[in-house]
Amino acid sequence: MNAEILAVGSELLLGQITNTNARFISNQLSELGINVFYHTVVGDNAKRLEQAIEVAESRADLIIFSGGLGPTKDDLTKETIARHLGVSLEFDEVALTYIEQFFAKRGRPMTENNRKQALILAGSEILANHHGMAPGMIFNNNNHTYILLPGPPKELEPMFQFEAKPKLAAMLNDGGIIASHVMRFYGIGEAELEVQVQDILDAQTNPTVAPLASDGEVTLRVTAKAETEQQAQQLIAAKVAEIQALVGDYQYGMDDDSLASKTVEMLLDNHLTISAAESLTAGLFQSELAEIPGVGDALIGGVVTYAAEAKVKHLGISQELIDTHGVVSGECAAAMASAVRKQFGTNIGIGLTGEAGPTAHDHQPVGTVWIGIAINDEEPLTYLLHLSGMRNTNRLRAVKFTCHYLMQLLEERGYTKRY
């Protein structure tokens, strides 16, 4: 099945909001084995929307609309589709009652135009909206399937995942199962990874293997179709093992894992504590770890020592070291890691220093990053990065590389790591 995602809203064309819905829907469809060849964005104009529908019908079996289901005049998705397909609109009594109760419970008057949100295409299957007012719907006509979803992501995402996706899976599978898992890699580029697994990519049938690069990470989505869930998972497990035999050294996790979550998991599993002294990342490393539940048993504390004076005052780094090597140096990163580990009494100390950009201040090229990692009483190890990107991109990548190198070091020392 081939799909096209058609987003409706002038605010998207004006750049006022980002079309995150298309990314979410595409990701969900890929798990079902549905091809998405086109993303289309149309403003709040009925004529142009109908033209876009005609084009989509010529090249897709499944057309998914986001937006334009609300109460105002510029919410015209349902009306345009109804006119285009020659079907009528009718009120869904369940949705209308819900909308009326919503206003009644809040003691607010319900304007007449809010009734419009309860209109549906006659003969369509309703997709319940548990996070808003306007219901979604699925409508089949002349070998095409139309799915209408609300625009707000907090409504669209749960509606698609829990209402539309199971119905699509049932349409596709005829009793079969499609399962999918994502392998996550760091420290290797997309091109290099593809070369390493090229034979697998060339020979793929079932399961399929699809590479993707984003934010410095590379993923491989492995998707299998089988009669049962168990059979699909067995097919995936065999393919994952085959890939791991080739590039397993670069894999850090699966599915929804992040570098931060896997780092915290490894620290907790091995009863290790960590502290950090940060310069260019200004607390971002600790912030990323702090988003993971349970991290309080591992992350003890840290300091942000942005200025050279702060490194001397709060970490006890010698002025002579800074004068000799500079604050953007391996020597400084190592000293920061060692000092913060001793200061907080942790198993691991992290030191991060560098030039995030856009201008250099320590006679080092923008994108130069030094990472220091001190583990117990060992001599600190340092890593040099040469990053290219915007300031905050460089800062985030420095954090990701820190997690990557730390997990590698711990694994080399025999600490357990889960996949």
Swiss-Prot record:
Coiled coil: none annotated. Pfam families: CinA, CinA_KH, MoCF_biosynth. SMART domains: MoCF_biosynth. Signal peptide: none annotated. InterPro entries: CinA (IPR050101), CinA-like_C (IPR036653), CinA_C (IPR008136), CinA_KH (IPR041424), Competence-induced_CinA (IPR008135), MoaB/Mog-like_dom_sf (IPR036425), MoaB/Mog_dom (IPR001453). NCBIfam families: cinA_nterm (TIGR00200), molyb_syn (TIGR00177), PncC_domain (TIGR00199), PRK00549.1 (NF001813). Belongs to the CinA family. PANTHER family: NICOTINAMIDE-NUCLEOTIDE AMIDOHYDROLASE PNCC (PTHR13939), NMN AMIDOHYDROLASE-LIKE PROTEIN YFAY (PTHR13939:SF0). This is Putative competence-damage inducible protein. It comes from Lysinibacillus sphaericus (strain C3-41). The lineage of its organism: Bacteria, Bacillati, Bacillota, Bacilli, Bacillales.
